[in-house]
């Protein structure tokens, strides 16, 4: 399976709340880079190394978010690097945080580096301010003149 097919398979699993395709595709030494670098904004931040650690991060992510759809806009693969651009729909249900559930819409880019046909590096890119606004955790900024 090439990198583009692998990404499509993993994303199809996410739409069904099935992490098995992702878990099967992860290299034991995976490095997982989140879109958030600041502590306290989300239950995830920074970089994580190793399959067991990443599984724990995914469990934390699943506490608040349920992915509903990943609509492919573009997937490009070149040798061992794969890029995907998606329109993502998800449910935000912040258990224990005292905030109401919300429907979220985001554009997300995902970059993978592969080793031996498995994901050795994952990085996601999305507008974290938009996510915080849609979650109700941040006010919509006043437009600048």
Where are the regions that the model predicts?
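C-terminal and inter-domain tail/linker signature
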Residues: 1-145
């Amino acid at each position: 399976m090439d990198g583009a097919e692998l990404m499509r398979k993993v994303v199809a699993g996410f739409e069904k709340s099935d992490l098995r395709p992702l878990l099967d595709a992860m290299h034991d030494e995976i490095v997982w880079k989140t879109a958030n670098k600041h502590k306290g904004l989300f239950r995830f931040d920074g970089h994580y190394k190793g399959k067991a650690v990443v599984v724990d991060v995914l469990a934390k992510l699943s506490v608040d978010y349920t992915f509903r759809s990943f609509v492919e806009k573009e997937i490009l693969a070149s040798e061992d690097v794969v890029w995907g651009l998606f329109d993502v729909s998800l449910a935000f249900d912040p258990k224990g945080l005292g905030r109401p559930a919300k429907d979220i819409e985001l554009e997300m880019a995902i970059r993978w580096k592969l080793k031996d046909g498995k994901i050795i590096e994952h990085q996601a890119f999305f507008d974290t301010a938009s996510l915080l606004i849609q979650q109700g955790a941040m006010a919509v900024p006043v437009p600048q003149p």
